[in-house]
């Protein structure tokens, strides 16, 4: 029976599993998502090396063309949706699987290493102390979305760390410096004392690549620090730290 396969490639080519390679190679139609994340060496050419029948798709295609995907399955073709990282981080994929299963078709999930799990490991903070994650987005119509501040604050007062994803647009990628600038502006609006000069954050840069870097910095140090090229990701730790977490942060400080 035709099968919908959700395949994660991990953060870079060295993390691509044998199972992922095998499934992509034998798939009838490969849809490569270009909007979920960036990789230093996974691109269209990489996917085409495994399978020539590749179509680059964006978020709108997956959300708005479920019927087209069902049609491909009806034509007795396996369909592979390939993503950088892990495929099931996106809720769109969950709804797609539910729809496909409801139509009587099979599905298969091939996990990949996600930036979520990766930065938790690299931060060396206690994995069970991470709360809800949130994305810092660019202002829209000159208005800043302060939702990230609210999420960080709620986690912070409960002794939980926050992972901050940074906005990814077709024409630009948010940097750690831009994200901190927005957090400072949010502080001016919210005035809860959360974002201050001496607050420590962890910044992951080009995770999974050979030149990756993970560093702990005080906010006042961010603007003079020479970061690597994006993608970046930020961890905003709580101040309710176990003594071993304190020592771990010291290991990441320059």
From Swiss-Prot:
Source species of the chain: Sulfurisphaera tokodaii (strain DSM 16993 / JCM 10545 / NBRC 100140 / 7) (Sulfolobus tokodaii)
Subunit record text: Homodimer.
Keywords: Methyltransferase, S-adenosyl-L-methionine, Transferase
UniProt-listed Pfam families: TP_methylase
Keyword Transferase tagged: yes
Name of the featured protein: Diphthine synthase
Catalytic activity: 2-[(3S)-amino-3-carboxypropyl]-L-histidyl-[translation elongation factor 2] + 3 S-adenosyl-L-methionine = diphthine-[translation elongation factor 2] + 3 S-adenosyl-L-homocysteine + 3 H(+)
Positions annotated to bind S-adenosyl-L-methionine: 11, 86, 89, 114-115, 166, 207, 232
Function of the molecule: S-adenosyl-L-methionine-dependent methyltransferase that catalyzes the trimethylation of the amino group of the modified target histidine residue in translation elongation factor 2 (EF-2), to form an intermediate called diphthine. The three successive methylation reactions represent the second step of diphthamide biosynthesis.
Domain of life: Archaea
PANTHER family: DIPHTHINE METHYL ESTER SYNTHASE, DIPHTHINE SYNTHASE
Single GO MF annotation: diphthine synthase activity
Pathway(s): Protein modification; peptidyl-diphthamide biosynthesis
GO terms (BP aspect): methylation; protein histidyl modification to diphthamide
Family: Belongs to the diphthine synthase family.
Enzyme Commission number(s) from the entry: 2.1.1.98
UniProt-listed InterPro entries: 4pyrrol_Mease, 4pyrrol_Methylase_sf, 4pyrrole_Mease_sub1, 4pyrrole_Mease_sub2, Dphthn_synthase
């Amino acid at each position: 029976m035709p099968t919908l396969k959700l395949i994660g490639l991990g953060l870079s080519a060295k993390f691509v599993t044998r199972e992922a390679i095998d499934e992509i190679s034998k798939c009838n139609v490969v849809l490569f998502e270009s909007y979920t994340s960036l990789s230093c060496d996974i691109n269209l050419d990489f996917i085409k090396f495994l399978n020539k029948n590749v179509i680059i798709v964006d978020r709108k295609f997956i959300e708005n063309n479920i019927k087209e995907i069902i049609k491909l399955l009806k034509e007795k073709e396996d369909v592979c949706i390939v993503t950088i990282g892990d495929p099931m981080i996106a809720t769109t994929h969950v709804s797609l699987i539910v729809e496909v299963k409801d139509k009587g078709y099979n599905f298969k999930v091939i996990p990949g290493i996600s930036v979520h799990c990766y930065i938790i490991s690299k931060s060396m903070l206690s994995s069970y102390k991470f709360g809800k994650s949130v994305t810092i987005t660019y202002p829209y119509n000159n208005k800043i979305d302060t939702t990230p501040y609210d999420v960080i604050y709620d986690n912070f007062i409960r002794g939980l760390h926050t992972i901050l994803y940074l906005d990814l647009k077709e024409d630009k990628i948010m940097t750690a410096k831009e994200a901190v600038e927005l957090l400072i502006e949010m502080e001016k609006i919210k005035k809860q004392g959360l974002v201050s000069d001496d607050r420590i954050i962890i910044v992951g840069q080009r995770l999974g690549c050979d030149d990756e870097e993970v560093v702990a910095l005080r906010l006042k140090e961010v603007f003079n620090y020479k970061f690597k090229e994006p993608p970046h990701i930020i961890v905003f730790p709580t101040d309710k730290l176990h003594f071993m977490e304190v020592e771990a942060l010291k290991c990441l400080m320059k």
